[in-house]
Amino acid sequence: MIEEQPGVNWQDLQLRVATILRECGLLPEVSRSLRLARGTVEIDVYATDPTTTPPAVYLCECKRWRSRVPQAEVQAFRTRISDAGAHFGFFISANGFQSGAFEVVEHTNVHLLDWQEFQNLFLERWCRTYWIPSLRTCGDRLAGYVDPAGSDAAIREAHGEPLKPAEAVGL
């Protein structure tokens, strides 16, 4: 799991989604307005993936409702994904979806995800692009405090034990 909780409100959920996408190498924008054929719409998280050719576009809808998201909301999002020409649509809900919602997105590029499913979808990429490099950076910072080649000799010397001739000259 990347993040424990989806946040306390919908704005927090949007920011957490954008953070995960950014850590995966995407370029997210929170609350972006898009002009479509039917008018201007507000997209919770708009992201492009510069690692693909051409860059893929992801549109995310984030709901932190107490109830399950109804089918009509999912239908409206699916239409926005189609009108925008996005490659992927992720509808992320903290409390799931009503049963008919899944039929609306069948055979489309729209994915209905709870918070855990969204994280699982990006977990491998997040580990590869963010977590492992972060661990390497931490390890590199600690490397100056560790001398694996001479540590055994340094311990013996600190305890007053005699050093072998090669150790005495640092070989």
Predicted regions and their residues:
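Mixed-charge (Asp/Glu-Lys/Arg
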Residues: 1-171
